[in-house]
Amino acid sequence: MAQGRRVERVAALIRKEVSELMINGIRDERVHHGMVSITEVEVSGDLQHCKIFVSVFGEAQERDQVLEGLQAASGFLRGELGRRLQMRRAPEVVFQLDRGLERGTSVLGLLNRLEDERQQRGDIPPGSDQQPGSDEQPTG
């Protein structure tokens, strides 16, 4: 269990340091095209590989540019992580776009559209929490 805690601690430190480096250390303009957030950091048990999930607020082209810039800076980031975290061998850094927020927004949009369609058909009254077919009478 101590190994798991160490991996979690290293992942948290990597997240902190990479966030700082994204603001002040990476000079590649592609990284600064959109609003970038690190959503998760996964580190392998042997601390040799690190996958950093990022969310980029912006158009698809901006997301691609940011990801390209981050991948191009991965060698620099690896060296900085090794120096800042005083690790003999810093993990290989790979960036991956986190589409979780995008998917969540899409699902919410679909649910809202479904509710609008049901209200237009008269299946449920507007602003009602009552489900169609339920026998509950609104209180009030």
From Swiss-Prot:
Disulphide linkage map: none
Compartment(s) of residence: Cytoplasm
Keywords assigned by UniProt, alphabetized: Cytoplasm, Ribosome biogenesis
Region (Disordered): 115-140
A Pfam family that the UniProt record links to this protein: RBFA
SUPFAM superfamilies hit by this protein: Ribosome-binding factor A, RbfA
Family designation: Belongs to the RbfA family.
Designated name of the protein: Ribosome-binding factor A
Lineage, uppermost ranks: Bacteria, Bacillati, Cyanobacteriota, Cyanophyceae, Synechococcales
